[in-house]
């Protein structure tokens, strides 16, 4: 068994993509390879086939390795619920909420046990483990309780790749400063540097690279050019920074930028559609006149709903709906579209009942039980069924939510799926809500929905005979790997591999 650790000088240096690319490169060499991240903090989650919740970035890395995601790849997931509070997902299951000051006191030992147990399992099954760190490995105020970076590297005696983002400036200072703050035994594991997101000619960097290698004795094993790609973003900062302009887009879809937006990977398939422009609209921004509005998932549904209510967005959404606009709510967005959300046990915060947006006759009650499961459902909505062939009416996705939703006026809505609890549609088909994450991954249905928007503008329909998004995602993983591999020398890490 071999192991490689990928750490970064900062957050957003490109660790996740680099780890995915290394997984793909090793897979191409014929090795059994698995990704691993001991602890992730993210609001983008994925549910494995076993019903376990892990970071979505590790799911992407698993697909890069040709694997189905599993809980051992990310035994700890922290999902921020407020500035100082997170939900703790341990071995795929929610085990509680914690304050930042209490987390390491309450979970450090349990967390390290989960990490080492997962590593033992993976070591027994795979030729290579590609580990990803988090943030920076040199946060000196946190190093003594860091579960993710050099503690894992030392445990595996893993040669470590240090990735730095030159696009942010100060790349040489970041690299040297990080090395200076590492302990000697940690520094000894750093076997190469990657300068990521470089724009320009490498010759302009040569003097700096020579200086860096002479000063540190460590080679620069890669200078990676700036890449445009559509692989899922790690968090919302990445997401909003990289949105591409599409001057020739024919359909505009507004996504409400909730303060605690979660699972925004739901929209990657829409971003990949050449004819679709996505706009992320904050609660205090003008909504405008998009062709459709999506209210996405949220880690703190009630708090984000209240933000919509105190801002202008709730009124804007109601006015948009009354004017005939199409609104789709996903997971927490579905809950917000209803009449009320009650939280009698204080699952998300102070107990109480809270007014929803009132666009669907629904009532949601929060509870301590969390639903995490893969789902396969049959579309039963007549308008969708008439457009889809029988084979394309089966769609796949996953649920991650707390709370149960009831329909208050059954005559005012139609069931969207063969399981009515998964989603409903208003009788005029302009307001839709579903608990199903990943619904846009289903290519034919995505095109049916987009064609409804196109028909509003007298645009020709898009063809429905397309594969699901996972085929496109796999193609993108190949493209990104093909773009990075020529600039990345892994021999110092792989030896004879």
UniProtKB/Swiss-Prot annotation:
GO terms for molecular function: ABC-type vitamin B12 transporter activity; catalytic activity. Disulfide bonds: none annotated. One of its GO terms (biological process) is cobalamin biosynthetic process. The keyword Chaperone does not apply. Keywords: Cobalamin biosynthesis, Glutamine amidotransferase. Pathway: Cofactor biosynthesis; adenosylcobalamin biosynthesis. Residues 250-445 form the GATase cobBQ-type domain. PANTHER family: COBYRIC ACID SYNTHASE (PTHR21343:SF1), DETHIOBIOTIN SYNTHETASE (PTHR21343). NCBIfam families: cobQ, PRK00784.1. Catalyzes amidations at positions B, D, E, and G on adenosylcobyrinic A,C-diamide. NH(2) groups are provided by glutamine, and one molecule of ATP is hydrogenolyzed for each amidation. This is Cobyric acid synthase. The lineage of its organism: Bacteria, Bacillati, Cyanobacteriota, Cyanophyceae, Acaryochloridales.
């Amino acid at each position: 068994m071999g192991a490689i650790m990928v750490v970064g000088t900062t957050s957003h240096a490109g660790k996740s993509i680099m780890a995915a690319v290394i997984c793909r490169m090793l897979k191409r060499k014929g090795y059994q390879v698995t990704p691993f991240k001991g602890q992730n903090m993210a609001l983008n989650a994925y549910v494995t086939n076993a019903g376990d919740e892990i970071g979505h970035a590790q799911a992407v890395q698993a697909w890069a390795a040709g694997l189905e995601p599993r809980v051992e790849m990310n035994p700890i997931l922290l999902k921020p619920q407020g500035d100082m509070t997170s939900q703790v997902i341990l071995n795929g299951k929610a085990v509680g909420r914690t304050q930042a000051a209490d987390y390491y006191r309450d979970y450090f030992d349990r967390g390290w046990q989960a990490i080492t147990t997962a590593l033992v399992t993976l070591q027994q099954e795979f030729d290579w483990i590609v580990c990803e760190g988090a943030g920076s490995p040199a946060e000196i105020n946190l190093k003594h309780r860091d579960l993710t970076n050099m503690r894992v590297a030392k445990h595996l005696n893993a040669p470590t790749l240090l990735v730095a983002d030159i696009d942010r400036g100060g790349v040489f200072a970041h690299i040297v400063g990080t090395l200076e703050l590492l302990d000697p035994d940690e520094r000894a594991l750093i076997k190469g540097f990657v300068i990521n997101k470089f724009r320009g000619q490498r010759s302009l960097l040569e003097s700096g690279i020579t200086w860096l290698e002479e000063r540190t004795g460590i080679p620069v094993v890669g200078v990676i050019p700036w890449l445009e790609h559509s692989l899922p973003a790690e968090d919302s900062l990445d997401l909003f920074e990289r949105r591409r302009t599409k001057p020739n887009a024919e359909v505009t879809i507004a996504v409400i930028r909730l303060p605690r937006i979660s699972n925004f990977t739901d929209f990657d398939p829409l971003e990949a559609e050449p004819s679709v422009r996505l706009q992320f609209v904050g609660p205090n921004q003008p909504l405008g006149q998009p062709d459709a509005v999506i209210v996405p998932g949220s880690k703190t549904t009630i708090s984000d709903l209240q933000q919509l209510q105190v801002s202008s967005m709730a009124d804007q959404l109601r006015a948009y709906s009354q004017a005939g606009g199409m609104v789709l709510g996903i997971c927490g967005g579905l809950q917000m579209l209803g009449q009320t959300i009650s939280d009698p046990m204080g699952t998300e915060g102070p107990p109480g009942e809270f007014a929803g947006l009132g666009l669907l006759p629904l009532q949601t009650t929060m509870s301590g039980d969390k639903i995490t499961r893969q789902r396969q459902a049959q579309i039963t909505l007549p308008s969708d069924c008439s457009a889809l062939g029988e084979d394309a009416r089966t769609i796949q996705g996953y649920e991650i939510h707390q709370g149960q939703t009831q329909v208050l006026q059954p005559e005012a809505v139609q069931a969207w799926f063969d399981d009515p609890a998964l989603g409903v549609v208003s009788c005029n088909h302009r307001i839709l809500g579903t608990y199903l994450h990943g619904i846009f991954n289903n290519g034919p249905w995505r095109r049916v929905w987009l064609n409804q928007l196109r028909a509003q503008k007298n645009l020709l329909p898009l063809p429905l005979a397309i594969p699901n998004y996972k085929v496109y995602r796999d193609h993108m993983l190949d493209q990104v790997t093909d773009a990075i591999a020529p600039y990345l020398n892994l021999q110092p890490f792989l030896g004879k591999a």
